[in-house]
Amino acid sequence: MRYLSFRKNSQIIAAGLLLADTNSILDLSHQSCIGLLGNTQPNLLDMVKLGLEPISKRIKESLKNDPPDKDAVIELKDVTFCAPIPNPGKIIGAAYNFTDALDERSLPYPKEPVIFIRSGLTTIGPYDPILIPPDVGNVGYEAELAVVMGKRALHVEPDVVMKLIAGFTAHNDVSGSGMIKEDKGNFVRGKNMPASAPFGPYLVTPDEIRNPYAIDIQLKVDGKTLQDGSTAKMYFKIAELISFISKQMPLEPGDIIATGTPGGLAMVHSPPAWLLPGQMVQVDLPGVGFLTNPVKQGVPYFEQ
């Protein structure tokens, strides 16, 4: 199933489900759907915490037996998407985790996963602008497959990891490469610029993904292909990666793991393909999601 978060009005973000026609969604906050969600609110993070599997089962049975209430159906063209998990507790990224990206820069393969933490406050959704702060240069793109945790993970072994996953989504791990270089490889500043972590449009449940290591990853800037790779080049696979992270810190439902990016990074192009205000970036992971974001300069406004 393909879940989403969408904005109903300026105050309310609700959960939805892409319907079989792929042209409309089911508004899970509609009164006709409340009984399908169990004892939780119609937002995707709460649903993940309760457990998406039983919710999905109830929804499938309901749709099989009866068509949805027409007032609960919204045409896709009228939906304002948010990130599937708009406020994740934390985002853990994997650096240096695709062999083609390492090979093109003549970098050694790491002996263990190299990870960094992003604030959940860097999250934005489809069509939201990627914001480049004033006086910050050398900002790069990184198209990635992201994993949303469905259950707590602490000191877990690889053989149980896939049972703990709620789903997958597309991600652009926008990075201040200039700051990372200035900080001698420290990721904190370069990976935590506000409005620099697009996700979406959907949280795709694991049963929809036949093989997570056979997903094409493509990124275009203004229509020009700059990354064209595959999760087949992932060095530390999902189970091994999440197991490693769980032995460094607890992972909670709704936390997001960004699994790394293929070759074609901005610095390897000639001239370097750093992101610039006015550009349009598209991330395409067939079967997972197509993510589009404009690039602007500025800082976001946070309401108090």
PLM features: what roles do these ranges have?
Residues 4, 81-83, 103-106, 130-139, ...:
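A generic local secondary-structure boundary/capping motif
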Residues 86, 93, 140-142, 252, ...:
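Residue-level recognition of short, solvent-exposed, well-ordered loop/turn junctions
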Residues 96, 118-120, 134, 141-145, ...:
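Short, structured patches in soluble enzyme cores that scaffold and shape functional sites
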Residues 18-19, 108-126, 141, 276-287:
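Structural signature of FAD isoalloxazine-binding scaffolds in flavoprotein oxidoreductases
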Residues 2, 90-91, 144, 256, ...:
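Residue-level marker of beta-strand positions
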Residues 9, 58-60, 74, 101, ...:
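Catalytic-pocket segment enriched in acidic/His residues
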Residues 1-94, 98-113:
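N-terminal non-catalytic cap/leader segment that marks the start of a structured domain
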